Amino acid sequence: RLCCYFNKPDIFAGIEQHEIDNPTGRPYLYAYPMLTSLPIIGPGGPNNAPDAEKILAVKPDVIFTTYATDKAAADKLQEKTGIPVCVLSYGETSTFDPKVSRSLTIIGKIIGMEERAQKLVALMDEFKNDLDARTRDIPQNMKPTAYVGGLGMKGAHGIESTQGNYSLFNAVNARNVVDETGRTGSVMIDKEQLIKWDPDKIFIDAAGYPSVLEDYKRNKQFYQTLSAVKHGEIYQILPYNFYTTNIDTAIADAYYIGKVLYPDQFQDIEPEEKADEIYRLLLGTAVYAQMAEDFGGFKRITLPE
C-alpha cells in the first residue's frame, strides 16, 4: 500500500490472495481495483511466508516486503528467487512514524520517483504539524478525557480492547485515560476500570462496533453507568488496521478525533471532506464514500434503548 501512494498501479507485477479475499476497508484497493486482477503470488497474510516460486513466475525486478521479520528471512527469499529483496517498515505506531518516511524514500529511489517520495514525506509532516499546532497549547484541565475501544488485535474485539500511548490520541495531544496505567500498545482492560475512569468521550473503531453492540445487548447496565453513554458522547472512527496500517485512514481519523475533542480548534475542518482530501493527496482519488458505505463513516453512535 505504500507503493500505491506513488499512484502508478502499473508498477505491480502480482498480488497476494489475502488482498483479494479481504478487500474491505483497504483504501488502496478502492482506489486501484485493477490490482485484484494481477497474478497471485502466494497466500499472503501475516502468518504465511512468501511463495518464492509464484513470485518468480511474475518476473519482478524487485521484491518489497514488510513482513520479513528479520534480515535472515529477507536474505533467504532473495537467495531463493535471485531477485533483490527490499525490507520496508510501517513502524511501531499507526501514524507519523519516521520509519514510514524512510520506507517511502527507499521506494522512491528504487522505482525512480524520488520527487513523489519527497512530496509524500512532506505531506505526512504537514498533517502531523497541523494536528499538533491546533492542539498543543490547550491546557490539560481544559481537555475532555478520552478512551478508544473496539480496537482490532488480530481480529475484532469489544469495548475492552484499547491502547495505551495511542498514536491517534497523541497526534492531537488528547488525554487518554489508559495512559495512567503506564502500559503502551494493545491493552485489554476490565470493564470495572472503565467505570472508574468514566471518560468524557469514547471512540469506537467501526470494525469492533458489532462486538460492542453485542456486548451492550448483554450488559446494558454496565454501559448505562458510563457518562459518555448517558450524554451521547460515543463516536465512531474508521478502522485503519487491515493487514497493517492504512496510514491515510488513520490520519483522517485523527482529524475527526480532533474535531470531536476540540471543536473550536477544528472549526474549519469538515471530517468527511478532510478524509477525501487526504485520500486524494496520497492515493490520487477520494474513497471516503466507499469507506463510509462499508463501515458507516464518522458519526455519533446512539446505542439502542
Where are these regions (language model features)?
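Extracytoplasmic substrate-binding proteins
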Residues: 73-154, 178-179, 233-304
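Short, structured coil segments at secondary-structure junctions
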Residues: 8, 80-82, 172-173, 230
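Short hydrophobic/charged patches on amphipathic alpha-helices used for structural packing
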Residues: 52-56, 166, 191-192
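Alpha-helical, coiled-coil/dimerization segments enriched in small aliphatic residues
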Residues: 157-185
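Alpha-helical scaffolding within the catalytic cores
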Residues: 72, 91, 133, 187-193, ...
